[in-house]
Amino acid sequence: LLVPTMSDERPVGTDVRRLSPRSIALSILLSCQRTDDALDELIEQRATSIPQPRDRSLVMELVYGTLRRQETIDWRLDAVLAKPLHKLPMVVQMLLRLGAYQLLFLDRIPASAAVNETVLLTKSYAKQLGRDWSGLVNGVLRNLIRVPAPPFPDPASYPAQSLSIRYGIPIW
């Protein structure tokens, strides 16, 4: 079954049966940003097509973890990006967040695998995005590995920002 549209949040021309857990996680994350659908419903709709329990678990970890730690991830990404994360296309933002979550918080996934899989996923979106962002994604994720994290904001001077970045709590 080939999917020729972008409305379903999948790369054009991908076979639903061959979607990787990362691709499905990205699809759910993008849908979560673009619709008012409940996250549990989005996961249930897409995760049921995954036959392996291990892959379903990875999808859920990637989705929930990326959303839970988004404040921290965005802070780390902004430190290695030349321009602010929010100025990039939404798909590229989510690809970077997905890759960064794996690098920063999942110690069972080798860094090289996290970078490589995210770059391959980025390439699959090149046609939809009008350009190939894989070079930027590769460079940013590799910089995340190389460049030490900047110090957290001072809790005495910036208590809300400090808590937000340390624990992934959005500032209200």
What is each of the regions a protein language model found here?
Residues 2-172:
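Class I Rossmann-like S-adenosyl-L-methionine
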